[in-house]
């Protein structure tokens, strides 16, 4: 049980997908202007990461490895991600049409989010079992959500602040992201 907790804390804080592994930077910068869209994107991405971790483990363990088709891992995982994202899009369209409209183009772009493919490949490389894969996927989503929501709230405050003209927009966003990354480096010694 403590191994699962350490995996969760390690993935959320120490090995954060956005600030340490630099995965998922496109939605991190693109959806972080308003906190409402950031929260919606966080839920959708966490759901997709968790479900993709489980399904990609099953596909790898019970289809690709027994049939000796390991060379098709990347293509297989891309197909799994596309199916999971389409499923998520249909569920969100039925349950929350407002959020579906707010996310707009970013929802289908989850398919091309490198964090999701990176998660599937890292699960295989780190030799996680089924439960560890699900925990790893969920904690990657929680870490992504934490960083995205905090960053979007900081960007909202920065938009209302008096910032020198050369630093407005993307410049101050990159500086803020760098400072957040430095702050998360403080968790490095937390898990060994």
UniProtKB/Swiss-Prot annotation:
InterPro entries: Ion_transpt_RnfA/RsxA, NqrDE/RnfAE, NqrDE/RnfAE_oxidrdctase
Subcellular location per the Swiss-Prot or TrEMBL entry: Cell inner membrane
GO CC list: plasma membrane
Superkingdom of the source species: Bacteria
Single Gene Ontology BP annotation: electron transport chain
EC number assigned by the record: 7.-.-.-
Enzyme class of the recorded protein, top EC level: translocase
HAMAP family noted in UniProt: RsxA_RnfA
Assembly information from the UniProt record: The complex is composed of six subunits: RnfA, RnfB, RnfC, RnfD, RnfE and RnfG.
Family membership: Belongs to the NqrDE/RnfAE family.
Task of the protein: Part of a membrane-bound complex that couples electron transfer with translocation of ions across the membrane.
Protein name according to UniProt: Ion-translocating oxidoreductase complex subunit A
